[in-house]
Structures are given as C-alpha cells and as structure tokens.
Amino acid sequence: MSLGNSAKNIGGFNTVYKAKASAPFVGILDLYPNAQIAFSVRKLSSSYTGNSLRVRRSSDNAEQDIGFLPNGNLDEAALTTFVGANNGFVTTWYDQSGNGNNAIQTTAIRQPLIVKIGTVQKVNGIPAVDYDSAGLLFHTYNFFIPTVDMLIYHVAERTTAGKVYSIFGSGNTLFGYFSNNILYFYGREAWAGGFNTTLGHTLMLGTANPTTYKVYQNNVDKTVFLSVAPYSGRFDFVNNYASTGQSGKMQEGIIWNLNRTADRTGITDNINTYYGIF
C-alpha cells in the first residue's frame, strides 16, 4: 500500500484522506540495549539486519538462513518452503546483540530441530528450537567472563524430568536446571525443590549485583540460595552435563553483563506480552 493522500468527492465537497503509516518496529533491545548475548526466534532490535537461524534440511543437507518478517516474527513461510516435508535442523543460532557471539553446531546428530516432517516446532503458537529429538548439546565456548552485575533469562519448555537443562554455562552452571529439583544461578544452588521438574512453558530470569542474587519463575521470586560456590568454567550456550542431554524447547535467551535489576519488571512484561507465558 502506498502512503500519501487520496481525495474523494462527497456531496460536492472534496475530502482528503491521509493514509496512516504503520508504527515502527521496536524490539526489547531497543528498550534495554547493550546485551552481551541475545538469541531469539523473534527480532530483538530495529537496528539488527541479520537472520535468526541457519537451518539444514534433511533431504539433501542444504543450508539456508532464516530471517524475520517486518513485524519481527520469524519468517515461517521461508522456513517451510526451504525445508518442505522434511526435517529442519538448526546449525547456527545468530547472536542479535551485535557482538557476533553466534551459537554454532557442526555435528549433525547434535543439531536441534526447528521443523519436524514439514511442521514448525512451536510452544504456545510461537516457533521454538527443539532439543527433544537430538537430546544433546548446542553450544559455543568462551564468550566472556561474567561479572557480578548481570540480568539473564531464557524462555523455554522443559519437557522431561531427570535431564539437565543448562541454558548458559559449563562447570558450575551459570544458569540452568542441574537435576530434577535444583536450579543453578551463577554457580549457586538457587532454588532446590518445590517445583514441577517438567515446568512447561516458563520464563526463568536471574538478576545479580554485588549484594543480591535473585531468581524468578514467571515473575515470582523463587530465590533460596543453598550454596556459595562462585561461577567458574567456560561459557556455553545450551550445554549438557555428563551426556545426559537436553530435553525441551527454547525460544529466547539474553544476557546483560551489567546491572539491570531496576529494569526487571519492564523486561519481564515485554517477554510475556510476546510469548504469552503466564
């Protein structure tokens, strides 16, 4: 549709109508910039001109980048046109922070699904990277050494109890589920017991500053620190532990390596408005 003016004669009077321009796209990183790492199936910044994922199709192992629609949603039509009735595996999840920290997996059997037999994998109607089938790891190494100040979150669906789901970190898990009933944050047992180990569609968010560590599930404070071990080890994205593999689907994960504790509510609202988690 062209933008401009159009005239129409009504009862002898010329009336001019002005076409209304659509609102400009605004992503979460426009509102809360300077992320260290940012992965998502939605566009996160108006200034980001890259793609969301690189996908390998099972029919001939060809690969193609998959980007976004003007509204910021993943281009599902491009994805299904490329993959067809086959399976589509993620070989690269692009970092939208501008720091080039792309998560890459070159081993075919360890690549998670995004399309299964022609159907885009989803949670709550929104595309999701599916670790259920591969059940292994998808990572990059040594992005950065985390400082004390941090806001970190992921949007995921953990589907099988008893498997580690370490979204970020290796060694002492930076952020993720260590076992059936323990969530680790910054190398500490942040939350032990009292939650459903499969969890379903969940926003897990952690904040850290020099004096306080907090973890939230769906905007509810669940912090109960039991250990005091500091985080150590390399930085991985969606790691596994002792070959237990991952179990679930992931849609988004961002780290701000700075103090955004005051922005937690706004960040949570932005995420929940898009994904409809709680």
Model-derived regions, located:
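Extracellular glycan-interaction patches encoded by glycine-rich segments
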Residues: A190-A192, A229-N257
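Extracellular low-complexity Ser/Thr/Asn/Gly-rich intrinsically disordered segments
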Residues: M1-L29, T106, V155, I167-F168, ...
